[in-house]
C-alpha cells in the first residue's frame, strides 16, 4: 500500500465507481482536497478532517469514503486569506473594465458597477466576467459618460454564497461617450441598439455570442404582421429573421472572444463574399442592431460582415482577420455607423491587387448617410471603395478619425458620392490617399498626411496625369482645407493655386469658402457641389487642428478596438512607408492569431484531464494530459501541421467538433518532459485506425465506440525528452484527442 500525503499537488487515475458519504461543498475559506472524478464531477474534503489519502491498486480512500478506480485527478487548494487583487482598471468609451488575479479554488466571481446611471452597486451580466487562465477580466458596456464609476469584484464560494469579506473595489474611473458625429446621425438618427447617451434603447434585447453558442443561441422574434412569434436558433438565423421587417426591437449582439469559420455552421454564414449578413427587405427596413465586441479581443477570424439594405445599424470594437472578399461591406444600407474596428489582412483573392484581401470596408449599391470613424487599417491593400457606378444621388458619407496605418490605396476611392473626409491620420500610405472618380464630391478637411504618396488625386489630371488610377476615367472634385502634408505628401500634391487646371484639389483658404464653378475636372467637366457650405445638408461637428490628429487618433480613446486590441504591430517607417507588399511578419501574426480567452467565468469547457483551476488547458505535469485539437491544440506541448477537419465525437461526456486531418500534410509534433503511456483517440469520420510515429506505422489495436463516434487506440509507451512526429498511417485519419498518462516511477 502506498500513502499519498497532502504535499502532493496532483496525480491521476482512471476507473469505474465511487462510494462517498462524507464529502463537503467547495469552500474557499478552508484548506481542501479536490477529487476530480472520471464523470466530470468533483468531491471536496476539508484537509483538517482528512489527514491522509491512501491508494491501493486503484482504490482511493479519503477518510471513511472509498473510490474504486474512478478518480481522474487530485488537487489541493489553500484557504484564501486576502482580498481580490485588482491588477488593472480603466474607463473607456461608454464602458469600463477590471482585471484581477484568480484564486485557485474559486470558479465564479460576481462583479458590480456603480456610477453614472447606477446610484448604487448593480451586478453586471455574468457573461461579461471571463477567465483568461492567468487572470480574470470583467467589462461593463452601455454606460453614460461620467467621472464617478467604480467596479467591485466579489469571489463566490462553492455554495454560491458571496465571500464579501474578500471583495475589492477599483479606484474611481472616468467613462467618456463615443463621438456621434457624421452623416449617420443626420436628422437625429441614432443607429443601433443604443441611445445617444450610450445606454440601451428602451426594450432592447441583449445577446451574448461566443464560439460555443454561435450556432445554438436562441431568440424569440415577431415573424408576421399579426404579432405572432417564433424562436430562431443561431446568430445567422436570428439576423435572417430580422430581414422580414416585423421585429424592430433594438438588439445588442455582444461578441465575446474569437469566433472562426470553424465555429460556425454553414446555415449561419452566407457565402465567402458576404460572411455574416444582416439584411433588410428594403433600404428603409428598421434594424436597430448593434454588433459590438466585449473587451479588447472580440474577433471574427475567417469571415467578414455584410449589411444589406436596412437602416439604423452599428458595428463597433471588433477585429477582422483572414476574411474572404471584403472585411465589411454595405449594400444599400442607410444610417450605418461602423467604428472602432481593427482591419487586418484578408485572405488573398484571385486578382493581382487582392494579395491582402479585397476591400477592407466597401460601400456600394446606393448606401447613404453612413459614418466610418475611429477605425484602424493595418497595412490594408484596397482600404475603402465608396460608391459603384449605379449611384445617382449624393448619398452623403463621412470618414473621420480613422488610422490608415501604412495601408496602400482607396482612403477612400469615391465614385459619384458626396463624402466628407476629416481628421484622419494617413500614416505612411504607400500609393494613393483620397481618390475622386466619376463625379465624386469630396471635402478633405484637417487630416494629417505623414509621408504619404499622392495624398489626393482626381482621375486623369494633376499628379495622376492621363494614366488614370481608376477604371472609371472621369474625374471628380476635391475641396481641401486645413490639412497638414509632411514628407512625400507635400512633394506630390498639386494645389489649384499653382496648377489652376491640372490640380489634385481645390485648396480653400477658409472652411466656408465655396469652390467656383469655373473649376472643373479635366475629364468629365464635373464641378463641386459645395455641400459642405450648405447648412441644410451638413451635420454639426468639431474638428481638431490637423497637427493634433496623430495624437488623437493613436491615443487611448483613438482608432481601433479598446486598448488598440489584443493583436498589435509596429511598422518600420523606413521600409514600410513606401512598400505595398505584404509584411510577412505581420501576415504570420495574423494567420497565427488566437485569443487567450478560456471562457466565461464558471462556464469554461474542460479540455484537460487535470490541473489547477484557472490554469488553462494544460494540466500540472504530474497529471494526465488530455489534449484536444478542436481548431487548435489545447496544450502548448503540441504543434500541428496541416489542417483541421470535422469529427464531432463525444468522449467522457464532452463533445469535440474538430481534429487534425492526417492526410499527406497532417502532422502532430511534441516532446514530452517525462515518460508517458499515450492513447490516441481518432474520429470514425475517417477510415484511419493507426498512425505513423517517427515514420514507423503503429501495430496496436483499439476499441471503436459507435455512440461516441471515436476509435480509441491501445496505449503506446513514449519517453521523455524525445521528439515525436505523428503522421498519416495506412489510411487518412482524424486525430481528435491525445491522452498522456504518466508512467509510475
Model-derived features with residue positions:
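Extracellular beta-rich repeat passengers
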Residues: 423, 430, 434-606
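Extracellular beta-strand/beta-solenoid scaffold signature
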Residues: 268-279, 301-304, 322-329, 350-364, ...
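Short, surface-exposed beta-strand/strand-loop-strand elements in extracellular ectodomains
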Residues: 686-698
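Beta-strand-rich modules
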Residues: 140-161
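Short beta-strands within extracellular/lumenal beta-sheet-rich domains
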Residues: 651-674, 685-688, 710-714, 732-737
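Extracellular beta-strand-rich solenoid/capping regions of secreted or surface-exposed proteins
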Residues: 229-248, 264-290, 299-316, 321-333, ...
Amino acid at each position: 500500500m502506498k500513502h499519498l500525503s497532502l504535499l502532493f499537488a496532483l496525480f491521476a487515475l482512471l476507473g469505474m465507481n465511487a462510494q462517498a458519504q462524507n464529502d463537503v461543498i467547495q469552500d474557499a475559506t478552508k484548506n481542501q482536497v479536490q477529487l476530480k472524478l472520471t464523470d466530470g464531477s468533483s468531491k471536496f474534503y476539508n484537509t483538517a478532517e482528512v489527514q491522509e489519502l491512501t491508494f491501493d491498486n486503484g482504490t482511493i480512500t479519503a477518510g471513511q469514503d472509498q473510490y474504486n478506480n474512478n478518480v481522474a485527478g487530485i488537487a489541493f487548494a489553500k484557504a484564501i486569506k486576502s482580498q481580490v487583487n485588482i491588477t488593472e482598471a480603466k474607463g473607456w468609451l461608454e464602458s469600463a473594465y477590471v482585471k484581477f488575479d484568480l484564486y485557485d479554488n474559486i470558479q465564479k466571481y460576481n462583479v458590480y458597477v456603480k456610477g453614472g446611471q447606477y446610484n448604487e452597486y448593480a451586478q453586471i451580466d455574468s457573461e461579461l466576467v471571463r477567465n483568461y487562465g492567468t487572470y480574470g477580466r470583467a467589462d461593463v458596456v452601455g454606460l453614460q459618460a461620467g467621472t464617478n464609476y467604480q467596479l467591485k469584484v466579489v469571489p463566490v464560494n462553492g455554495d454560491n454564497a458571496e465571500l464579501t469579506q474578500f471583495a475589492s473595489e477599483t479606484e474611481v474611473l472616468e467613462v467618456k461617450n463615443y463621438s456621434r458625429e457624421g452623416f449617420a446621425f443626420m436628422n437625429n438618427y441614432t443607429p443601433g441598439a443604443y441611445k445617444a447617451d450610450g445606454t440601451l434603447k428602451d426594450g432592447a434585447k441583449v445577446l451574448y455570442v461566443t464560439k460555443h453558442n454561435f450556432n445554438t443561441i436562441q431568440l424569440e422574434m415577431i415573424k408576421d404582421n399579426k404579432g405572432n412569434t417564433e424562436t430562431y436558433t443561431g446568430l445567422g438565423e436570428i439576423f435572417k429573421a430580422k430581414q422580414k421587417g416585423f421585429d424592430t426591437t433594438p438588439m445588442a449582439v455582444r461578441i465575446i472572444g474569437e469566433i472562426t469559420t470553424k465555429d460556425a455552421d454553414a446555415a449561419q454564414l452566407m457565402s465567402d463574399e458576404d460572411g455574416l449578413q444582416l439584411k433588410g427587405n428594403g433600404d428603409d427596413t428598421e434594424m436597430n442592431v448593434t454588433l459590438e465586441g466585449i473587451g479588447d479581443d472580440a474577433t471574427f477570424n475567417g469571415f467578414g460582415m455584410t449589411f444589406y439594405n436596412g437602416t439604423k445599424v452599428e458595428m463597433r470594437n471588433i477585429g477582422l482577420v483572414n476574411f474572404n472578399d471584403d472585411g465589411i461591406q454595405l449594400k444599400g444600407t442607410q444610417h450605418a455607423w461602423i467604428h472602432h474596428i481593427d482591419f487586418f489582412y484578408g485572405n488573398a483573392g484571385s486578382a493581382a491587387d487582392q494579395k491582402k484581401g479585397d476591400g477592407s470596408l466597401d460601400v456600394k449599391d446606393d448606401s447613404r448617410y453612413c459614418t466610418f470613424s475611429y477605425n484602424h487599417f493595418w497595412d490594408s491593400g484596397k482600404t475603402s471603395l465608396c460608391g459603384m457606378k449605379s449611384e445617382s444621388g449624393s448619398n452623403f458619407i463621412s470618414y473621420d478619425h480613422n488610422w490608415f496605418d501604412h495601408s496602400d490605396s482607396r482612403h477612400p476611392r469615391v465614385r459619384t458620392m458626396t463624402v466628407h473626409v476629416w481628421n484622419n491620420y494617413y500614416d505612411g500610405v504607400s500609393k494613393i490617399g483620397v481618390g475622386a472618380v466619376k463625379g465624386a464630391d469630396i471635402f478633405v478637411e484637417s487630416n494629417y498626411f505623414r509621408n504619404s504618396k499622392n495624398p489626393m488625386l482626381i482621375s486623369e489630371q494633376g499628379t495622376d496625369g492621363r494614366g488614370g488610377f481608376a477604371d472609371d476615367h472621369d474625374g471628380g472634385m476635391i475641396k481641401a482645407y486645413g490639412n497638414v502634408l509632411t514628407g512625400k505628401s507635400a512633394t506630390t500634391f498639386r494645389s489649384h493655386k499653382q496648377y489652376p487646371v491640372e490640380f489634385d484639389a481645390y485648396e480653400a483658404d477658409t472652411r466656408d469658402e465655396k469652390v467656383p464653378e469655373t473649376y472643373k475636372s479635366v475629364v468629365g467637366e464635373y464641378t463641386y457641389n459645395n455641400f459642405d457650405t450648405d447648412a441644410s445638408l451638413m451635420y454639426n461637428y468639431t474638428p481638431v487642428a490637423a497637427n493634433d490628429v496623430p495624437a488623437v487618433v493613436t491615443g487611448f480613446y483613438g482608432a481601433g478596438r479598446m486598448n488598440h486590441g489584443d493583436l498589435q504591430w509596429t511598422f518600420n517607417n523606413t521600409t514600410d512607408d513606401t512598400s505595398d507588399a505584404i509584411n510577412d511578419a505581420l501576415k504570420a501574426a495574423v494567420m497565427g492569431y488566437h485569443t487567450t480567452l478560456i471562457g466565461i467565468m464558471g462556464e469554461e469547457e474542460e479540455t484537460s484531464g487535470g490541473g489547477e483551476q484557472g490554469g488553462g488547458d494544460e494540466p500540472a505535469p504530474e497529471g494526465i494530459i488530455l489534449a484536444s485539437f478542436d481548431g487548435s491544440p489545447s496544450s502548448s506541448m503540441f504543434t500541428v501541421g496541416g489542417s483541421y477537419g470535422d469529427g464531432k465525437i463525444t468522449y467522457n461526456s464532452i463533445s469535440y467538433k474538430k481534429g487534425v486531418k492526417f492526410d499527406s500534410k497532417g502532422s502532430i509534433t511534441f516532446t514530452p518532459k517525462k515518460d508517458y503511456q499515450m492513447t490516441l483517440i481518432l474520429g470514425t469520420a475517417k477510415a484511419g485506425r493507426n498512425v505513423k510515429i517517427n515514420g514507423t506505422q503503429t501495430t496496436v489495436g483499439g476499441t471503436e465506440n459507435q455512440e461516441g463516434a471515436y476509435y480509441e487506440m491501445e496505449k503506446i509507451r513514449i519517453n521523455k525528452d524525445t521528439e515525436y512526429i505523428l503522421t498519416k498511417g495506412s489510411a487518412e485519419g482524424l486525430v481528435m484527442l491525445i491522452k498522456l498518462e504518466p508512467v509510475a516511477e
